[in-house]
Amino acid sequence: MMRTRKGHKVYPLTVAQKFHLYYAPHCPNMAVLNIGTSLTIEVELDWDQLKKSINEAYARNEGMRVRFAKDKEGTWYQYVMDPEEREIEFVDFSDKTIEEAEAEMQKWTTVPFKMFDAPLTRIVMIKMPDGFNGVYFLGNHMIVDAQSLICFLKDIIELYCNAKYEGVPYPKDMASYVEQIQRDFAYEAGSKAQLRDIEYFQKEIEKSEPIYNDLHGTEKLQSMREMFKNPELRSAFCVTDDTKSALDIFHLEAEPTKRLMDFCEKYHVSLACLLLMGLRTYYQKMNGFDDVSLTTTIARRATLKEKKSGGTRIIPSRSARSFHRI
C-alpha cells in the first residue's frame, strides 16, 4: 500500500476518476481522456505577463497539479505536486490560415498524456491569423472537467488583467482540491448521507433494468434482440474505435438563447442540466421508451468551494416519464 509519493501524501481515486479508468483502457489509446480548447481575444497581449499569470494560476490551483501513481499491486493513487515554474510554449499561427491553425491544435488534442508522475495539462500561448490571441488548453479528464477548466482559464484572465490594468482587483483564492476530495471520501466511508443515497438509488435500480436508447431510434436494439433471439433484451453494443476529435460550431438564435438563459435563472437550473434534460427528451421521442439513462461527466458542484476546487466530477441520470406527456 502506497502512503507517499515523491514526498507527497497520496490519496485514493475519486468515483469520477475510477469511472474514467473503467472505460479508457478499452479504447485505442488514452487520448480518449483528452479535453482540448482554446480561448482567444482580439487584442495584443503581453506574452511575458501572460506566461507569469499562467504559472501563478497553476500555483493557486491544487487540482491542476495532480499526478498519478500505481503501487506494486496495481492500485492507483493521486497526489498534488508543489508549485513549480513551467515552461509555457508559444506558437505563432499568423502566417497560417484559420483552418490550418485549428487542424494543428486538433492534432495536439490527439496526443495522450503520460499517466504516471507527469503533468496532465498543457497550455500553449497562441497568436492566431485573424488577429486574435490567447491560449490553447489541453487537459486530461482524470483531473479536469468543464467546470474546473472554465474556472482555471478565468483565473488566468483575472490574474493577467490585475497585473496589466489599473482598478482590476486580484482574484479571490481558489479552494483546496485536497480538502474537497477528503470530504468526498468521508461521504463514501459509510456516512448517513451515503446510506440514504444508496437506499434511494437501489430502489430506482430495482424498479426495472435500464433500456438502451439510440440517437437514431430503436433499430440498433431491435438488431441485438434478433441476434440474441431475445425479444425482451434491453441492452445493445454501442462501441467505436475512433477517438479522433473534431470541432463543430452551432449558432443558436438570440431569442431562443435568451429563453433558455431566463429559464435557468428563474428556476436556478444550470445550463448543463437543462441540456441534459433536453437530451433525455430527445432520446425518449426517438425511441419511444419511458425510461432513459445517461452517464455524463458534468459539473456536479453545489457549493462555491466545490466549484473552485478543480478536479473532475460525475453524475448518473435516469429519468422515467410517461411518453404521452411529452
What are these regions (language model features)?
Residues 41-45, 139-144, 323-326:
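A generic structural motif
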Residues 75-81, 101-103, 135, 167, ...:
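Generic recognition of long tandem-repeat/solenoid scaffolds
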Residues 2-13, 17, 30-49, 115-137, ...:
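Gly/Ser/Thr-rich phosphate-binding loops and adjoining beta-strand/alpha-helix segments
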Residues 73-74, 84-85, 130, 140-144, ...:
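Short, solvent-exposed loop/turn segments at secondary-structure junctions
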Residues 16-17, 46-65, 101-109, 122-125, ...:
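Structural preference for long, well-ordered alpha-helical segments in enzyme cores
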Residues 167, 199, 203-210, 313-326:
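Helical lid/core segments from catalytic subdomains that handle acyl or acyl-like groups
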Residues 3-5, 10-12, 16, 91, ...:
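Active-site-proximal acidic secondary-structure segment that organizes catalysis
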Residues 1-28, 51-96, 119, 154, ...:
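Short amphipathic alpha-helices and their capping loops
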